[in-house]
């Protein structure tokens, strides 16, 4: 059993991509410290600055959501995929073994990414504007996107969040609640994970 783990995106050092087209900041993965061939689930934030192919991950289901910037075009013409990821906070899902090229639509963009190993976990990226309870599912993660949020005695702002895996029995944790009075509408990225099999359909055009 692990306690809820807090993180701050601004304190996580980015890992540059080998092709020089961007970088990734890992928020959490399970098991902790697992490599790209061994994780069961992984959540990260990536900055995409130049065109190039996505790395292929056989046996992994992926979800991606635009956080900031003009967005990117996801293209695999031999599979009939040509999708503009240009709407903030609207996640899309695709199979990790699809050969997808990524083309920036105008400058660098920042994206929220979820990877799930097939047969191990299932879940989805959501954007919530109401209270949620970190630790209420077998595993998961939440990250503040905008506004101010109260968690127990702590206040969280954009880029701050929590992740968990087998944290505690349901009902043992405080709710994460939006606070009013700010200029930005409160929003939080929410990933609730449960054991099971998930197979994403090919990315829609």
Please provide the spans of the model-predicted regions:
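Jelly-roll (double-stranded beta-helix
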Residues: 1-205
